[in-house]
From Swiss-Prot:
One Pfam family here: p450
Record: residues binding heme: C432
Name of the gene encoding the protein in the UniProt record: orf2
Keywords per UniProt: Heme, Iron, Membrane, Metal-binding, Monooxygenase, Oxidoreductase, Transmembrane, Transmembrane helix
Enzyme Commission code: 1.-.-.-
GO cellular component: membrane
Topology within the bilayer: Single-pass membrane protein
Subcellular compartments: Membrane
Protein name: Cytochrome P450 monooxygenase orf2
Coiled-coil region(s): none
Organism domain of life: Eukaryota
Native organism: Aspergillus niger (strain ATCC MYA-4892 / CBS 513.88 / FGSC A1513)
Amino acid sequence: MESLAHLPGIFLPLAGCVLALSLTTIVYRTVTNPLSHIPGPQISKWSSLIEQYYWFAGTKVEYVDYLHRKYGPIVRVTPTEVDICDLPAVREIHRVRGGYLKSEWYKSLTPPGVTSLLTLIEPAQYSEWRRLLAGPLSDTSLGKVEPMVTNHVHATIDRIASDLQSQGVSDLYKWWTYMATDVVSELSFGEPIGLLARPKETAWVMDYLDKVGIMHAWRTTFPFVFVLGRFMPVHPFKHAIQAIGLLGKWARQSIQQYRQHIQEQPESPKPTLFTKLFKTGKFDDFQLTYLAGSYITAGSHTTAVTLLYLIYAICSDNEVRQKLLAEIRTLPENFRHDELRHLPYLNQVITETLRKYAVVSSALPRVVPAGGATLAGYYLPGGTTVSTQAYTLHRNEAIFPNPEKFDPSRWESPTQDMKDAYMPFGGASRMCIGNSLALMEIRLTTTLFLRRFPEVHMSRQNGMRDEDLAQEQYLIMAPRGQRLLVEA
């Protein structure tokens, strides 16, 4: 018992030694880390806290862009991640069969046991899924659904006109989101969710879409929040999680209805984005339900936000407006989408919108292949997470002079560097399969909307201001004010 009395006196020196040894180990590992020679702030060598702070604030892309302007084309963002905006290095990272696989970070975007095209890492599995999913979204296949898309566009513009007549203003963020959601849901299952026809009954969809960005931030950083949320009386995403449940219920019902439709018409079922998936028999209803949700997220929000910023840019520049209107007036009354594909200025306006207001402009993390690689003049060992972000690439002054100016004419004769740095739909090896659908919706909507409302302008009612259009950047970008009120 007497020996135990001496323990307090022994414990303090022992604890001090353990602490000193731990700190020494941390310092040694930090100093000898193979990324220690990469430029960047000192905090990036020790912790991810600063990066996580900006990620949750929706301003990480601006923080990383600031680091590039201060430190150069390659910067250390966290102890294990670097970001690169050097164009030759970006080409190498996103080269088809280049060996730079997606990082494990993507898997944190989905619940355990669930896979989507976005989160697939292995190239062979991704190629198999892409073959099944991309066919209905090709330019050729989309020609068959053009009448359906056009009908939704007309219905949306009628809703906007009704708002303008009764209230004097209309919120384009709301209506573009409703339209794009109905389009992608009908393409997925043959029937739309019904936001345009029943906006009050389906308002829960907006509860989900409005929170999807910050929910991704929480899921990728603190996934346990969603697990514990089921047992918490108060939860920051209560309404969004309820909306996810309603979305899942709608998707399951739609899947069952489509299965019955296939049984009734096995030789000629109504084609949808999921028709081939049904035929393979490899996807259960749980997986299909999640895919439906991911399609609606990716296919609605991105298109709606792009349209919102396109109209905002036109409202802000009368020269752009008049030049675009003059081109649109050359179209016949009953034009087709193919004719819009060949309108030079319309497509320059769209391309410039996607440059300055890219909806997916945050980091695209990849993993350096085994054996390491030299990128932007620095050696990176295999396994290093290396990211690129369109936000910085699209603002490279050497490639895009005066990058903050909305200038569609810069795309009259684009250089090869402009084409390579332009990444609104992701890198070449994993480019979004829905880009053709998005462009069809954007071309048709822009043209038909401006034909109906050539004098549209941003409203100043209800406190609407330019600051509402500040970009909030998570996995996908959205206007911080989540609205664009217009008058016409």
